[in-house]
């Protein structure tokens, strides 16, 4: 929520700036926000179909909006993928294929961010230090956390026994904490699921061309999300900064905030956004940019996701009644 950040600020001045925003640029911002999830659906479709399972793009778009909604409302964005697996299973995509596809995409999603930041560190180091300042350490921590995540996820996908060992350790811990009471019965179900999972994982390990195609799409997806802020910048009548510089600042926010276990990075994301962007505009305008940017690339997508989830549920209920 942005309310704590607005405490003590001149709300009338901020509202005046918001009312003066150019609506045509905001439409472009919204289109790029939607394109962010559509491109994710394209990646998911490529991965799933490469495993020999048909999937329509419109279904992929539905899964990505549902995933976005549940990521937004759960700590560490942990709820999206389980819900995507559930809805994909409802559409006859096996749990093994959907789980590996989503994990494979997650690895590539993180690699895409590191690839973008790698370009920044190689060619725009001065810009990096100038705008991050004493937050540079947080940027490095974010890069480190993403690297560790990629390594752990890769062990799961590319190691034959990695996922089994991790799952068994997790089961043992849950049993000790009395979360899982019937360990043997749970392990039998887990092993059956892992057999399906490994079938998909073996396929992914041998299809590197899929990796590079999806990586290209995912880099575009990341840039599409970051570009939302550029259109907001234009909507507020700002000038003097290049699109790439605005995109780099937004990418710094992503690296530094993604590591924090808050639902959607709510609160902290807004604060860090203002900290970064008040360096290229006055604080009042930065506050307005934060509200517009967050509204477009988070809350609007959440609302669409809620309608998509509700619509999917209603279609399911209607289908069940027709079969009865």
Features from the language model and the residues they span:
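Membrane-interface helix starts
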Residues: 20-29, 202-216
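Transmembrane helix-loop-helix hairpins in multi-pass inner-membrane proteins
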Residues: 1-12, 16, 70-181, 262, ...
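Short, membrane-interfacial amphipathic segments enriched in basic
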Residues: 176-197
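Membrane-embedded helical hairpins/re-entrant loop segments and their flanking transmembrane helices
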Residues: 41-69, 232-249
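Core segments of transmembrane alpha-helices
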Residues: 112-114, 193-195, 217-229
